[in-house]
Amino acid sequence: MKIFTSAQIHELDKYTIEHEPITSLNLMERAAKALTRAIEQEWSNRTPVVVFAGPGNNGGDALAVARLLSEDGYGVSVFLFNVHNKLSADCATNKKRLIEGKRVKQFTEVTVNFDPPQLEAGMLVVDGLFGSGLNKPLAGGFAAMVKYINQSAAKIVSIDLPSGLMSEDNSYNISANIIRADLTLTLQQKKLSMMMADNQQYLGRIKVLDIRLSPEFIQRTESRCSILEEKDIRQLLKPRGDFAHKGSMGTALLIAGSYGMAGASVLATRACLRTGVGKVITHTPKRNYEIMQISVPEAVLQMDTEETIFSEPVDTEDYHAMGIGPGLGTSEATAIALIAQLRRCTCPVVVDADALNILASHRAWMQQLPKNLIFTPHPRELDRLAGITSSNCTERLYKACELADRLHGYILLKGHFSALCHPDGKVEFCSTGNSGMATAGSGDVLTGIITALLARGYKQADAARIGMYLHGLAGDLAIKDLGKESLIASDLTDYLPKAFLRLEE
């Protein structure tokens, strides 16, 4: 699914109107019918409904929804905010239709002072004040109205976006002046702001409603950001040949683990094997030998000369891919070995965990790295790598894109909607995964998965795409049996077979 900017959304509406053809008013009616159906699926007509409509087209949608709900037997009270006496043309027409229909319990057009209605538990608020066209924080009376709605016990459903939330960058927005919806009914496509963790408090559940905007425009229009879906991943997967053997399925090298962190090398190695690679060689300190040999008998072990740390670079000529970093430690000897390893590496590489922390502490080394590496930081690791001081998710995403460009590589920023930032500036969000995966070792599993895919011959971008989707899908399948609270990292590896089977259906 492509994610369009607010300007592109406007052009999509315009193109649909001109080429379907359909009037803007009839397109608004189509959207209102989809919105009404979605509301009626959630709330019965015994639920009192209060609609707050703004002066623009989002308000026009809300007025049309109010009319349709009232026709279906809902008790609807409507408040249209028209303080500047300037409604959009379609909003004005829907105001006229609503009044002429005489079905709503109450219609109030607010032009000066406003005495807000009592909002109570058991009521439904339809928020249609502002949509994706908003480009500045709410202030004054609208901000006060938002605060009043948020303080109520009523359920809130927002049309397209919660009022006050902008469709893209909210780094300078005012949190108190944004509606906190229980359900957001967004039209045609998700917006970029919906992919940011710090905006989830406003969105509630999200439903995307298909209002049949031009498929031709959507297909031919480039978007910087998109969401990876199951159909996209199915198209990328290569069938395993009947005559495949371990030599043809790739050999992966994992450099992982230090004293006390053998578990990281176990997790990465098991995940790598479960992702179908022909052979895995794990380079780890001597102290980890027995743990690794017992925990992962399928792996080939290569022991470092040191007892407790990674200290010597490995010749990668015989390997098809390398993953480095899980549980590695950050000693000075390991840091020196790491940069030497990355400089001499001749195969595709995944850089994770302590390897990222070492690079963050030696930023000058980052300019010496080969191109097309895949970096897999969680948010705090990215902050250290990129020198970010703000915790704003949008700024973090932009910095990840800048870093991908500067390093000529891929930044896979892990999170609920993991974001794959390409060196050309494109961003792909993952649609799988859940909060149960927020547990130690989950990233080590991801490193193993992507390393295996690289070793099997997938290009860097495809390995990262498939890897993060598989990782999240395994987590989604696992919580169906185990729940979120008890999920641990090794469960993700255990559910990889089911994830593959799902994609092969």
Where are these regions (language model features)?
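N-terminal small/polar loop signature for handling phosphorylated ligands or for N-terminal nucleophile
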Residues: A64-N150, E290-Q302, S311-V314
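Internal gly/pro-rich beta-alpha loop/helix module
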Residues: M123-L124, L129-S223
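Small-residue (G/A/S/T)-rich helix-start motifs and N-terminal tracts that mark the onset
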Residues: M1-N82, S88, L183, M194-V349, ...
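Short acidic loop-to-helix transition motifs that present clustered carboxylates
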Residues: V112-N113, L161-S167, L192, E307-I309, ...
